[in-house]
Amino acid sequence: MNSSVEKQNSEIPEKENEEFTFQDNSQGFELEFSTNKKTLSKIQKANLSLKTNDAFNISFLKAFSRKNHIYYHVNYKEFSVDICDTHGKNYLPLVTKSEIKKNLDKIKDEKVRSTISDIHFGAIKVLIKARFREGINSPIKMALIDDRITDRQDSILGAAHGNLVYGKFMFTVYPKYTTSILDQRLDRTLAFIHHFERNDLMRKGDKVFSITYLVAYALANSHHSIDYKEKDAIEIDDVFSEIGSVKSPTFTELDPEPNSWAIDIAQGKQPIGFKPKPTVSNNFLRFDKETSPSSSHQKSLEEISDKIDTLVVKLNNIS
């Protein structure tokens, strides 16, 4: 008899929809959650994996006639986040100068290593995994930004809103652009920020979730040596779309070309990278902008003219 009951139960189809309701008011917080094993199983089986082929077209026609040196990397990192660091006030650098230097040092040919000048960012996959039981309403907002860009709207590479109710949430961003290894603020090129909305779920010192991420990038000797895969700016697996959503960066629609515009084309400009020569005057070390012979001559004439004007004023006062 027990076997027939088990058989009947196994034939009962699972509900396709989950019910998730909660109430938050002055009386307190109340949560009612129900789900099916099918969706939960899908999310639990979702793997964090990223290959260079996911981001780059490796077999790419050589750019121009220059010999290209390209070194592909996929970096993996994981760390736990304290509940006090989930308010969106901090950022996580996904690529750092020290990391790039470490990979550059692995290039044995010093001559080739000295030519590497660019970092091509192909893809970043981020996995957030809860350190608490499944079934707790735990919304989280995330964004990957290029923090070197001062305009906040333009800095967004991709944004996501999810929930750790099933234990984890995952998405992938495809930056598909290049920066110099000499960039002064390289550590801010890929900055991950997050805001966990249940910041009262635990107390300071408690690790609320872990962040695991994979970054696929290439080190190369040219800005023109990489071909990226055709991908949307940000993607989310279908299974995670049931508990969250992603937003791509906006693409500006250009205004019609203005009827008139201007640009300064005056002579006497200094070349890019120009550094003024230091001079010592009255015990002061000065770094004045070097002037061309023509501008120096013009300055001398102006100084003579000023002295003549001053002398005329003094003579008038005497008379």
Curated annotation (Swiss-Prot):
Keywords: Coiled coil, Host cell junction, Transport, Viral movement protein
Cellular location(s): Host cell junction, Host plasmodesma
Main location: host cell
A cellular-component GO term for this protein: host cell plasmodesma
One example of a Gene Ontology biological process annotation: transport of virus in host, cell to cell
Pfam families: MP
InterPro entries: Caulimoviridae_Movement (IPR051596), Viral_movement (IPR028919)
Coiled coil: 289-319
Domain of life: Viruses
UniProt region (Disordered), positions on chain: 1-20
Family, as annotated: Belongs to the caulimoviridae movement protein family.
Functional summary from the UniProt entry: Transports viral genome to neighboring plant cells directly through plasmosdesmata, without any budding. The movement protein allows efficient cell to cell propagation, by bypassing the host cell wall barrier. Acts by forming tubules structures that increase the size exclusion limit (SEL) of plasmodesmata, thereby allowing viral ribonucleocapsids to spread directly to neighboring cells.
Subunit structure: Homotrimer, through the coiled-coil domain. Interacts with VAP.
Identification of the protein by name: Movement protein
